[in-house]
UniProtKB/Swiss-Prot annotation:
Enzyme category, top tier: hydrolase
Protein name as annotated: NAD-capped RNA hydrolase NudC
Domain of life: Bacteria
Short name of one Pfam family: NUDIX
Binding of a divalent metal cation 3, residues: 174, 178, 219
Gene responsible for this protein: nudC
Organism: Salmonella typhimurium (strain LT2 / SGSC1412 / ATCC 700720)
InterPro entries given in the database record: NAD-cap_RNA_hydrolase_NudC, NudC-like_C, NUDIX_hydrolase-like_dom_sf, NUDIX_hydrolase_CS, NUDIX_hydrolase_dom, RNA_Hydrolase_NudC, Znr_NADH_PPase
Length: 257
């Protein structure tokens, strides 16, 4: 699937190594390969954006390596492709040897996979399913500060799906574990690939059912109900958490304004 980059090759360039992204001048490289000293490198076409190819190059650059978070304010489709590139680069880096027999692996020519010629095992990129849920109680929404994000941002609850668990069960369990409340009338909203490191966020809205807030201090600094027109600092636009909060606010405005 990969190829040698030629002088006149053009497009968007995802140059990635160890979950980092090359961001000269703080932006994704876009244009001719020759302008970015990429001629002769191997590249894998991982998608298309606005009619131009998006290329993945597995390479470390001495300067300007940053996090894919730095391009979160790009259009959603381009951010998604950047995340795909970083995740694929890490997949290829971490699967050089077979986990069953220890022999060297090689990339598939037909799909995003690594193959073992010795035992014929096949590996695919790992994707971790997560749930994220906005919980509404009349004119208020449940928002929390997470232990791992000590930046004053308040957001909705989220967590990983466990083995043998449905998405609906994961929502009920995570909400109970983190906040001590029960929810009802769960409704699917959307999903978002989230490359931190390799999650698929599955977003829901729910209504408060019963219980008082009792936080899990290992997960949350605090949690509270916030009226829709008096909200604290929120996650940035482009995140599925912000989408859920804005959708909940819109529902409240329709009923209470």
């Amino acid at each position: 699937m990969d190829r040698i980059i030629e002088k006149l090759e053009s497009g968007w360039w995802i140059v990635s190594h160890e979950q980092k992204l090359w961001l000269p001048y703080g932006e994704l490289p876009h244009g001719l390969a020759a302008n970015f000293d990429l001629v002769g490198q191997r590249a894998l076409r991982i998608g298309e954006w606005q009619g131009e190819p998006v290329w993945l190059v597995l390479q470390h650059r001495r300067h300007d390596m940053g996090s894919v978070r730095q391009v979160i304010d790009q259009e959603a489709g381009l951010f998604q492709l950047a995340g795909r590139g970083v995740q694929l680069a890490e997949f290829y880096r971490s699967h050089k040897f077979c986990g069953y027999c220890g022999h060297p692996m090689h990339p598939s020519k037909t799909e995003w996979a690594m193959l073992c010629s010795h035992c014929r095992e096949r590996y695919y990129p790992q994707i971790a399913p997560c749930i994220i849920v906005a919980i509404r109680r009349e004119d208020s929404i449940l928002l929390a500060q997470h232990v791992r994000h000590r930046n004053g941002v308040h957001t909705v609850l989220a967590g990983f799906v466990e083995v043998g668990e449905t998405l609906e069960q994961a929502v009920a369990r995570e909400v109970m574990e983190e906040s001590g409340i029960k929810v009802k009338n769960l409704r699917y909203v959307t999903s978002q690939p989230w490359p931190f490191p390799q999650s698929l966020m599955t977003a829901f809205m729910a209504e408060y059912d019963s219980g008082e807030i009792v936080i899990d201090p290992k997960e949350l600094l605090e949690a509270n109900w916030y009226r829709y027109d008096d909200l604290p600092l929120l996650p940035p636009p482009g995140t599925v958490a912000r989408r859920l909060i804005e959708d909940t606010v819109a529902m409240c405005r329709a009923e209470y304004d």
